[in-house]
Amino acid sequence: MSKSDYYDLLGLSKNATPEEIKKAYRKMALKYHPDKNPGDKAAEEKFKELSEAYDVLIDKDKRAAYDRYGHSAFSDGSGRGGFDFNSGFSTDFSDIFNDLFGGGFRGGRSSSKRQDGGTVGSDLRLDIEITLEDSFNGTKVPINYVTHVKCSSCSGSGSEGSVKSVQCNTCHGAGNIRTQQGFFTIERTCHVCNGEGEIIKNKCKKCSGSGRVRDEVNLLVTVPKGIESGDKIRLNGKGEAGYRGAQSGDLYVYPNIKKHKFFTRNGADLYCNVPIKMILATLGGHIEMPSIDGTWTKVKVPEGSQNGDKLRLKEKGMPVINSSRRGDMYIQITVETPINLTKQQKELLKKFDEEPNTVECNPQSTGFFQKVKSFWNDIRSS
């Protein structure tokens, strides 16, 4: 009986990409897998053909040989480096079948790995909101959440009385059951002990043998100085309690820093925009600036300061986390143009503008308009 074309089996074109091959095989394998068709020999044979096709087409070298020689590339005595499918597949199918069957599949050589002590608890995430001042000073934040906690009646064992548990006779303590189907070893969680490998004789009435119950947890979280939005605080063992005394998961607390009315932050540096009067920018002087630590600092504004200029205050920013250092604070100047001037004030400004040395007083604007004038003169003369 002649073999079907591998590309036709998977419904693919000759130039199919590896991702298309994997997608097609996943779809067909789900349809014909023996677990989905118990006792159906035709489906089992179809599944073997599909797996054989996938094993060849997903491998670059095997695919090249198949494209050149067809099925004869893998026949005994072909002289072309034949592949013996009776020895099993070299391709790792586990990622495919983990997606399809929830992680219970083992391709080729099977594994008996099982975590001792039962199913560990899940990690949990909790988001909190803090102020920039909280981040600067460090703080303690009360939190509460509901999760599985260790049962107080049985101390997490799930059992009442002195006899805790006995070995499961179905899986013999392994927690899983293996069956051989064609080329594959299928490994499933034991349905009798739910993968624990043990059976409790007298289950705790409070937790029904799970060793844990749902309850509210109240904690006080220590937020370190300098923490930023997106950082996380890990609380070991404060996540979900494990099943029947297994290890608990961790709790991850993610702080979100509220928008500040005055400062913006970039790492350990702080930034703020400060409007100053035109006269102060022109003549120079000083301004009083608040810092995040609550102190005030006298800051010198240089004579002739321009809009957008930055003034730097060293080590007036945020603490660097787990360090004694601090970032800097940057003050960006916004020069405020006077409005609602009186007639007399306007006259004084006009008089100033008419002074003979105003060109030297305004080099940027004077230079700009000189360039514009030169540009138009060049156009007219061309």
Swiss-Prot record:
Organism: Ehrlichia ruminantium (strain Welgevonden)
Record comment regarding domains: The J domain is necessary and sufficient to stimulate DnaK ATPase activity. Zinc center 1 plays an important role in the autonomous, DnaK-independent chaperone activity of DnaJ. Zinc center 2 is essential for interaction with DnaK and for DnaJ activity.
Name of the protein: Chaperone protein DnaJ
Stretches assigned to the J domain: 5-70
Localization (cell): Cytoplasm
Binding-site list for Zn(2+) 1: C151, C154, C204, C207
Cellular component GO terms, alphabetical: cytoplasm
Cofactor(s) it depends on: Zn(2+)
